[in-house]
């Protein structure tokens, strides 16, 4: 029989390749097949077997019957031992070929009795597979072999195991027993064939081959001793015997019961091995490979008859069996027999030995090394001898086994506990675990902390510390932006080694100190021949840790020494470091840096009933992990319930899966089943009450779970010792905070700084951020009258040193700057949870930057959408920590430092949303506007302030019919009506606000500590705000002084600090509400600055928005026409949008709205403007009278919402920086004046009559035109038509009938007199009135071109037709009065302000620019949708824009031309993407727009999308690009050179600029107007706006020269004039502005006039740079423009153009930019010379009459200079033309 067994072994060894097919069938085999079926199968497959097989089957039936009888019997420990010893002897006997007769007898006895009770499915399949392989097998297998193989399927088919971290608690004992069965089948496959082991594990367990490859093969191959799997192994002997430790159903019940009882006891006694140590049973099943002790044999014989049922049952085993099994394992490892199965036995013993250690370490919960889900690190540890198997492997040297063991053991323990419960962190190392198991998590905080702190301190070297902690700082999977996120707010010198986009390189990102470089710098690590070094460094290293260690010890090449975070530096033992290393990347978001936490403060001394159970302090960092946070209870506070006691009601743990269903109830010691890979945030309350906040993988939010405590009264943080109502039905307003409340000051002496909980970075949606302005309420409010449980805690940790009374808890010294806020979205969350509803609790975790600014861990829109509509009874008033307190308030909640000092610490970076803490889809679920400052520092406004657009100093508004009844969703978190309970939470200042009964129901006031309406990174106004922004939203920045940093509000004490504070203590100067709503021209801060420049002649009591009183006309107006008054005349063409004439009745209605207002204002100032009522109606005051038609209203609102408002309001924190200001700031040595108008004298009085008259004429026609005074305030208001008619006329509105209610609509006599009646009145002094509509007097080329364009596009010269086209509506025409006819008769009437002629407007309404103006046409909806799409972060369009802006700002590219080229390419690419592929509903909107087009119209998508892309891309990068420009030209010293020459040229006369006497230079008045236009050009933000204004400048220059219409003013004359204008106006930023437009405008837009005049500007700048040198070289004191030897010729080209019609040569002077190519020059010439076939022409170089064709890429200037000294000319002629050039030199050549 034994020989037959060995023959079968030989046969099976030769069939290793066939076993892969057998195992494929194995997976599909039924695991619970009936015995009869299995028997039939066996009969069919072993037809050739002997009678012994039949007897075995009969015996199998008998054994199965016996097993059913014995399932309820619990065996004693010695039974189990005898089984193990017997099986060990079995192995020995078979391995040693019956060397011992005693063993042989035992083996024979086993043949009769030791049968398996389960169907022989496995052996049947294997035999059937063998036959299918066409191999004849004589089944002489003995009954023992059959039964041993059948025993492999003794257990039912194991259920698929859940993921390791999500297995329910109830299965945590069943799982290990089942997985052994799974693993054993894999063992079989691995022992049989090394190639099929992975597949076998996969087929049996359902896991991916990749997982098995990582977790199993390296371990097994390494542990076979020779590095390869033994190929002669077979599925008998050892592999069969190892199948023993399968638990029966009874044993599983026993395990669960014991585990449940153990959990309730909360003890550290080990579970009996027979119950919970399957790995030890595995060990026992294989030890004794060569055991011949008589004791074992006797025990086997005594219990031989009972072994047939022991393959499934496990009984209680004494703890000493573990020691015995361990000794047997050790003995087995040293007992090898040649020529036997001992190598496999030894391998198994090693596995079991490893299992024994890990099982003890994991608290007897699982067998890790043979478990399919064993931690890969354990496998790696065993396979590679402790080397790291991760991204470090190629870079790190082999490290010590000891430290890796601790790391792997600690990680194994933590992973194990995350399945069956969160362990206390204090796992002992592998050396200690052999003696005692780890304590469970319910041992209490102190016991668990002791377990981690008991490790003796040791001296850890830097290299060892780096190696152990490498999972934190070595993050090759992240890129630049991720590293920047992680290092925000960390210590100087903190670093992260990350991946790099360049091949064979990595990068180390370092947080640099101030004044040493950027906030975070990145240094490349290069690898050459396996040698590492920093880029361009002379130091080389063999590994990254050695490189880091070097730069951590010296500061040779880096500006700062590298260092680990403080927590890692101060860890004094390996155990703590290893535990911290488990956090990996989450460490950075998990642990606050010392820069934020400040010095560690001693722990809070717990009171009798108030234990500070804080698992988040830096002193206990190792008690938490990214896999789950361990939270503890103090035994002194709450005792565990009695053994076996059912869970208390209300202590249920609720599912965080989003469905809200109950998973079950657990006792206090129970830990949540972490079914969604969630991380636990913990709130430890003062009464020992434990609250866990699970961050679920659901859309909504955090589920609030509470574990019950013994005492029925639960102590809440807000309570002072009085027990509260029972937990579930409790109706309380409580503060959930990680801080201990300050009311317990007598009990709590000191507070330890807190540590925030990190959201899991895998599947979790991080908690939403809190409102930054919210502050804690008065803590004495523990109950409310309503029936809702509202946990609306808004806890702000004070950053100041002092604490204020009555302002909420003040913790410590203010160093712990972390806030966690829990807010509800359901009225009764606990009842909702118990009823299975999804609750929407949110945990707001906020991080503080080094400067003290709060940063949200996720955007505020990442929170649940359900919380956007809180029921008013469930709300608690969210008060503002910045709320100003009156002097009677007694104390300030912020205490300590002044607001100015705090504002100085404002961080501009990374206001919210750590990308690494958010899964991609969840991160993109929030709006684009929520990611305002992820990558940039342009806007300092905190995104959480978006929800508070009302300032705290605003008097309460009546919400009935008010604006708050229609407030947008972004204001949804604003409580609309504070209840009496809520009022008790107000700070003293707020209590004053709501003191009266009438105000008790008014709108609560929120602090708007950022700026006026928030703008996203793309510069967009937040949705729903443009038409609904309460007007007070702007008063903050209007009334705060500039030096306050835009982050403070004026207080009563500080209101006398400057004129920018509100008048008489009020922030309101009664600016019209509609002007505030549509403040789209400039920011409110600009308006404040301009207000300081108001005329000194005005009386102090004169309100800014009030019409001037009588007596201020005449000469007084001269003072009002100052540069500061004129500089903001109109924002753009859109701001001067034509509107219809206002009828007298409508004007009357407007006038009648303010009679009392006007009278009262003569006496005092309003505290609140009555015009707010129009804001409440979402209308302007004039809309109530209906004076504007619907299209005009729609246009204005849409324009404000889509771009104009956003471009201005987004700058709410500061004025738009101009290039002039940037240069003045960067180069203070230049001493540039604030407004460079050094040579402009005051405006003459002779100009004023025309100015005033024409302004009033424009008003008479339109009734809504802004006056100079109104534009000083930078606003568009319906009230402007009231006083702009008399602001400059000096007539009081009460006495005037000019355009007022006394005028009849048909009576034009009142305003006819102001219209000019002949062209003589049109001179250069009146051009400024047109601003964006200047008269055009250019050369005939442009005039004729524009005329043809006009005729072709509009069909007539009727200006109203064009206006209707611009407005996209046909009803925007003026009434057919005298004014209209006169306007048509005189194309250049002064009313071009509203009704410019075709000729006068066309240069600005260039076809390329019209679509940018025509925003109310068919393409308006498409434009609006595109902007909306850019705010949807889930769209590819928005994400690409965001990423591009981020990369551009982080790039170190120093060449502005390269940056602009990238921006231009990106904008073009995104336009193509939208048009070709579309996204969202773009194509649907496009089809809708197409349907609105007429048959002869088309929609210029390119122009429309161009304006959109400018807003989305150029606007956010504007100042960044300007900074690059200034740096670039500063390095080249071009700015200094230009400023020096401008200062010199400013004093020169017109003749010195080479202006011929026949050309009249611009007058001083014209220069003044041009200077204002140039200033407005610099303030314009977008290239198209700048281009419009620049064309205005050019047109104004032409008219200012007085050239008769149609007269040619060529480049020879125009360039000197332009140089003169630039010098006189001090336009130092001319070159940068020209380059800005050149680089960012679409190239096709620069064809024709825009490109020509931009080139002229560049040429003028080049001339100015060499002005002094050229003047000196000329010898005449003036520039000679026709001299070819002057340096100025580098910017001017003189080109000969032969006229083949008459045989003459024409000479043209062309302005050129430096290094202009031939192709560009040819394009300019073709345009100027009206060449219709430019492809037939080319530019030639004539040197001594010899023609040389210049290629397109050549530079004509260089070619000419290269021929200097010779007679060289440039000729533009037809390529095929044969021309004999004259030998006489032309003039000027």
UniProtKB/Swiss-Prot annotation:
Per the database record, which ranges form the VPS9 domain?
Answer: 1531-1673
SMART domains recorded: RA (SM00314), SH2 (SM00252), VPS9 (SM00167)
Location of the region described as Disordered in the Swiss-Prot/TrEMBL record: 53-120, 140-190, 218-237, 261-317, 329-378, 401-460, 632-689, 744-787, 852-918, 969-1006, 1040-1067, 1094-1123, 1138-1160
Tissue localization of expression is: In late cellular blastoderm embryos, it is expressed in the posterior end. Then, as development proceeds, it is expressed in the developing midgut, amnioserosa and in a specific subset of CNS neurons. Isoform 1 is expressed earlier in developing midgut and amnioserosa, but is not expressed in the CNS.
Electron transport as a keyword of this entry, yes or no, is no
Bias type Basic and acidic residues, positions: 903-914
Could you give one GO CC term from the UniProt record? cytosol
All copies of the SH2 domain together span 473-566
- PROSITE patterns for this protein: RA (PS50200), SH2 (PS50001), VPS9 (PS51205)
List GO molecular-function terms, semicolon-separated. GTPase activator activity; guanyl-nucleotide exchange factor activity; protein kinase binding; receptor tyrosine kinase binding; small GTPase binding
Gene Ontology biological process terms in this record: axon extension; positive regulation of border follicle cell migration; positive regulation of receptor-mediated endocytosis; regulation of Rab protein signal transduction; signal transduction; vesicle-mediated transport
What the entry lists under InterPro entries is as follows: RA_dom (IPR000159), SH2 (IPR000980), SH2_dom_sf (IPR036860), VPS9 (IPR003123), Vps9-like (IPR045046), VPS9_dom_sf (IPR037191)
Listed Polar residues bias regions: 140-149, 223-233, 337-361, 857-868, 994-1006, 1048-1065
Q: Where is the composition biased (Acidic residues)?
A: 176-185, 428-445
Protein transport among the record's keywords? no
Please note every region of biased composition (Pro residues). Answer: 639-649
Compositionally biased, Low complexity: which spans?
82-114, 295-317, 409-418, 671-686, 974-984, 1143-1154
Instruction: Tell me the keywords, alphabetical order.
Output: Developmental protein, GTPase activation, SH2 domain
**Domain Ras-associating, residue spans:** 1689-1777
Q: Which family does the UniProt entry place this protein in?
A: Belongs to the RIN (Ras interaction/interference) family.
What this protein is reported to do is described as: Potential Ras effector protein. May function as a guanine nucleotide exchange (GEF), by exchanging bound GDP for free GTP.
- Name of the featured protein: Protein sprint
Q: Which organism is it from?
A: Drosophila melanogaster (Fruit fly)
Per the UniProt record, the lineage of the source organism begins with: Eukaryota, Metazoa, Ecdysozoa, Arthropoda, Hexapoda
User: Source gene?
Assistant: spri
């Amino acid at each position: 029989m034994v020989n037959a067994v060995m023959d079968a072994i030989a046969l099976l060894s030769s069939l290793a390749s066939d076993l892969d097919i057998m195992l494929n069938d194995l997976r599909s085999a039924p695991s619970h097949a009936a015995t009869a079926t299995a028997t039939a199968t066996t009969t069919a497959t072993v037809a050739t077997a002997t009678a012994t097989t039949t007897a075995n089957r009969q015996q199998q039936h008998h054994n199965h019957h016996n097993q059913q009888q014995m399932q309820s019997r619990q065996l004693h420990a010695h039974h189990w031992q005898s089984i193990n010893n017997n099986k060990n002897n079995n192995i020995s006997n078979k391995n040693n070929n019956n060397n011992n007769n005693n063993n042989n007898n035992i083996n024979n006895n086993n043949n009769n009795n030791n049968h398996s009770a389960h169907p022989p499915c496995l052996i049947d399949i294997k035999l059937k597979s063998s036959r299918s392989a066409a191999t004849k097998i004589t089944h002489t297998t003995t009954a023992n072999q059959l039964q041993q193989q059948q025993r492999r399927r003794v257990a039912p088919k194991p259920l698929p195991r859940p993921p390791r971290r999500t297995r329910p608690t109830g299965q945590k004992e069943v799982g290990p027993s089942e997985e052994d069965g799974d693993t054993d089948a894999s063992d079989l496959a691995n022992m049989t064939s090394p190639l099929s082991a992975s597949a076998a594990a996969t087929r049996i367990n359902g896991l991916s081959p990749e997982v098995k490859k990582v977790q199993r093969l390296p371990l097994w191959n390494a542990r076979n001793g020779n590095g390869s799997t033994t190929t002669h192994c077979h599925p008998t002997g050892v592999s069969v015997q190892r199948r023993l430790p399968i638990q029966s159903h009874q044993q599983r019940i026993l395990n669960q019961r014991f585990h449940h009882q153990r959990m309730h006891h909360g003890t550290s006694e080990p579970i009996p091995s027979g119950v919970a140590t399957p790995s030890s049973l595995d060990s026992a099943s294989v030890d004794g490979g060569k055991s011949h002790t008589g004791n074992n044999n006797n025990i086997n014989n005594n219990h031989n008859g009972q072994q047939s049922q022991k393959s499934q049952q496990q009984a209680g085993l004494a703890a000493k069996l573990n020691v015995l099994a361990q000794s047997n394992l050790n003995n087995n490892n040293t007992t090898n027999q040649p020529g036997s199965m001992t190598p496999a036995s030894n391998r198994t013993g090693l596995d079991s030995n490893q299992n024994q250690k890990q099982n003890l370490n994991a608290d007897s919960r699982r067998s890790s090394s043979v478990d399919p889900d064993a931690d890969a690190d354990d496998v790696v540890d065993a396979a590679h001898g402790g080397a790291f198997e991760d991204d470090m492997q190629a870079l790190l040297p082999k490290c010590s086994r000891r430290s890796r063991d601790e790391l792997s053991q600690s990680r194994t323990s933590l992973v194990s506990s995350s399945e069956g419960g969160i362990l206390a962190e204090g796992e002992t190392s592998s050396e200690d675990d052999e003696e005692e198991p780890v304590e469970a998590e319910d041992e209490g905080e102190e016991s668990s902390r002791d377990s981690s702190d008991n490790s003796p301190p040791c001296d850890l070297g830097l290299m060892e510390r780096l190696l152990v902690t490498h999972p934190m700082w070595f993050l090759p999977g992240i890129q630049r932006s991720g590293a920047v996120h992680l290092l925000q707010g960390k210590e100087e010198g903190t670093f992260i080694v990350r991946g790099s986009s360049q091949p064979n390189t990595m990068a180390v990102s370092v947080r640099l100190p101030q004044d040493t470089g950027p906030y975070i710098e990145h240094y490349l690590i290069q690898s050459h021949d396996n040698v590492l070094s920093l880029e361009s460094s002379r130091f080389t290293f063999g590994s990254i840790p050695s490189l880091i260690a070097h730069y951590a010890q010296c500061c040779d090449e880096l500006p700062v020494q590298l260092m680990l975070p403080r927590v890692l530096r101060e860890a004094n033992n390996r155990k703590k470091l290893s535990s911290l290393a488990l956090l990996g990347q989450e460490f950075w978001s998990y642990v606050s840096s010392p820069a934020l936490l400040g010095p560690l403060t001693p722990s809070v001394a717990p009171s009798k009933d108030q234990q500070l159970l804080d698992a988040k302090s830096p002193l206990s960092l190792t008690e938490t992990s990214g896999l789950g946070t361990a939270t503890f209870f103090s035994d002194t506070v709450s005792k565990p319930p009695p053994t076996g006691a059912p869970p208390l009601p209300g202590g249920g743990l609720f599912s965080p899966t989003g469905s809200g269903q109950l998973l079950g109830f657990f006792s206090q010691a129970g830990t949540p089943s972490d079914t969604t890979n969630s991380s636990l945030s913990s709130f430890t309350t003062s009464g020992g009450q434990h609250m866990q906040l699970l961050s679920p993988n659901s859309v909504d939010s955090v589920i609030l779970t509470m574990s019950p405590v013994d005492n029925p009264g639960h102590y809440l943080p807000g309570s002072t010792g009085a027990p509260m109502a029972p937990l579930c039905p409790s109706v309380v307003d409580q503060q959930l905070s990680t801080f201990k409340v300050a009311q317990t000051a007598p009990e709590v002496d000191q507070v330890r700084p807190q540590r925030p909980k990190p959201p899991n970075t895998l599947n979790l949606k991080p908690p939403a951020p809190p409102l930054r302005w919210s502050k804690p309420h008065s803590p004495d409010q523990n109950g409310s009258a309503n029936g809702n449980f509202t946990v609306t805690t808004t806890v702000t940790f004070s950053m100041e040193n002092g604490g204020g009374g009555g302002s909420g808890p003040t913790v410590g010294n203010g160093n712990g700057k972390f806030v966690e806020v829990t807010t509800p979205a359901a009225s009764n969350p606990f009842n909702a949870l118990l009823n299975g509803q999804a609750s929407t609790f949110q945990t707001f975790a906020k991080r503080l930057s080094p400067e003290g600014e709060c940063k949200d861990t996720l955007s505020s829109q990442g929170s649940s959408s359900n919380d956007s509509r809180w029921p008013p009874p469930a709300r608690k008033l969210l008060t503002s920590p910045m709320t100003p307190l009156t002097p009677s308030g007694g104390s300030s909640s912020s205490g300590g430092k002044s607001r100015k000092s705090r504002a100085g610490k404002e961080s501009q970076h990374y206001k919210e949303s750590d990308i690494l803490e958010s899964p991609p889809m969840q991160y993109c679920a929030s709006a684009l506007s929520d990611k305002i400052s992820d990558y940039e520092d342009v806007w300092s406004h905190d995104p959480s302030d978006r929800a508070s657009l009302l300032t705290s100093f605003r008097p309460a508004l009546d919400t009935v019919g008010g604006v708050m009844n229609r407030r947008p969703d972004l204001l949804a978190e604003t409580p609309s009506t504070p209840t009496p309970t809520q009022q008790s939470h107000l700070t003293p200042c707020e209590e004053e606000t709501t003191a009266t009964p009438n105000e008790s129901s008014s709108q609560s006031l929120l602090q708007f500590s950022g700026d006026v309406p928030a703008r996203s990174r793309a510069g967009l106004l937040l949705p729903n705000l443009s038409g609904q922004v309460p007007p007070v939203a702007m008063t903050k920045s209007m009334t705060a002084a500039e030096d306050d940093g835009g982050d403070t509000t004026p207080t009563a004490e500080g209101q006398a600090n400057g004129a920018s504070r509100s008048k008489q203590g009020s922030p309101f100067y009664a600016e019209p509400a509609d002007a505030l709503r549509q403040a789209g021209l400039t920011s409110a801060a600009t308006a404040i600055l301009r207000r300081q420049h108001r005329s000194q002649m005005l009386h102090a009591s004169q309100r800014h928005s009030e019409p001037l009183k009588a007596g201020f006309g005449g000469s007084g107006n001269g003072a009002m026409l100052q540069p500061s008054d004129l500089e903001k005349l109109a924002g753009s063409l859109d701001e001067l949008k034509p509107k219809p004439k206002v009828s007298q009745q409508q004007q009357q209605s407007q006038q009648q709205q303010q009679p009392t207002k006007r009278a009262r204002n003569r006496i005092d100032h309003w505290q609140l403007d009555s015009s707010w009522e129009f804001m409440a109606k979402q209308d302007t005051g004039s809309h109530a009278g209906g004076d504007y038609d619907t299209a005009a209203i729609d246009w204005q609102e849409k324009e404000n919402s889509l771009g104009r408002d956003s471009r201005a309001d987004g700058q709410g924190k500061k004025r738009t920086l101009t290039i002039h200001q940037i240069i003045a700031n960067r180069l203070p040595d230049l001493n540039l004046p604030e407004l460079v108008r050094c040579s402009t004298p005051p405006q003459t009085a002779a100009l004023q009559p025309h100015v005033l008259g024409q302004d009033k004429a424009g008003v008479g026609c339109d009734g809504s035109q802004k006056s100079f005074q109104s534009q000083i305030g930078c606003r568009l208001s319906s009230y402007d038509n009231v006083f702009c008619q008399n602001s400059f006329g000096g007539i009081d509105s009460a006495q005037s009938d000019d355009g007022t209610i006394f005028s009849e609509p048909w009576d034009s006599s009142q305003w006819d007199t102001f219209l000019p009646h002949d062209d003589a009145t049109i001179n250069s002094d009146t051009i400024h009135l047109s601003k964006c509509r200047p008269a055009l007097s250019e050369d005939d080329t442009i005039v004729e071109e524009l005329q043809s364009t006009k005729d072709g596009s509009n069909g007539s010269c009727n200006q109203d037709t064009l206006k209707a086209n611009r407005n996209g509506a046909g009803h925007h025409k003026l009434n057919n009065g005298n004014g209209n006819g006169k306007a048509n008769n005189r194309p250049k009437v002064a009313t071009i302000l509203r009704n410019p002629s075709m000729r006068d407007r066309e240069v600005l309404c260039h076809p390329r620019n019209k679509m940018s103006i025509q925003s109310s046409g068919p393409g308006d909806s498409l434009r609006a949708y595109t902007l909306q799409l850019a705010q949807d972060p889930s769209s590819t369009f928005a994400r690409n824009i965001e990423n591009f802006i981020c990369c551009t700002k982080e790039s170190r590219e120093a060449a502005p031309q390269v940056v602009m080229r990238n921006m231009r390419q990106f904008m073009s690419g995104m336009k193509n993407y939208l048009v070709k592929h579309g996204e969202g509903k773009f194509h649907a909107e496009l089809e809708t727009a197409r349907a609105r087009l007429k048959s002869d119209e088309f929609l210029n998508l390119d122009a429309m999308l161009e304006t959109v892309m400018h807003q989305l891309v150029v606007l956010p990068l504007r100042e960044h690009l300007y900074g690059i420009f200034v740096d670039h030209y500063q390095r080249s010293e071009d700015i200094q050179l230009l400023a020096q020459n401008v200062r010199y040229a400013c004093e020169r006369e017109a003749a010195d600029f080479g202006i011929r006497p026949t050309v009249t230079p611009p007058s001083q008045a014209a220069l003044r107007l041009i200077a204002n236009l140039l200033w407005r050009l610099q303030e314009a933000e977008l290239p198209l706006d700048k281009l419009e204004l620049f064309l205005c400048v050019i047109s104004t220059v032409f008219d200012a020269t007085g050239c008769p219409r149609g007269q040619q003013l060529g480049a020879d004359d125009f360039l000197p004039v332009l140089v003169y204008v630039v010098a006189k106006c001090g336009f130092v930023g001319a070159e940068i502005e020209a380059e800005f437009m050149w680089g960012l405008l679409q190239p096709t837009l620069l064809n024709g006039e825009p490109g020509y005049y931009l080139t002229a500007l560049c040429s003028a700048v080049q001339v100015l740079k060499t002005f002094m040198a050229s003047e000196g070289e000329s010898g005449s004191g003036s520039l000679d423009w026709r001299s070819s030897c002057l340096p100025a010729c580098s910017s001017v080209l003189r080109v000969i153009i032969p006229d083949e019609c008459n045989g003459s040569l024409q000479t043209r002077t062309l302005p050129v930019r430096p290094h202009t190519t031939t192709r560009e020059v040819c394009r300019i010439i073709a345009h100027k010379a009206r060449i219709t076939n430019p492809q037939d022409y080319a530019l030639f170089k004539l040197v001594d009459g010899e023609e040389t064709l210049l290629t397109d890429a050549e530079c004509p200037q260089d070619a000419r200079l290269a021929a200097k000294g010779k007679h060289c000319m440039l000729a533009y002629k037809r390529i095929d033309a044969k021309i004999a050039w004259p030998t006489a030199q032309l003039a000027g050549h």
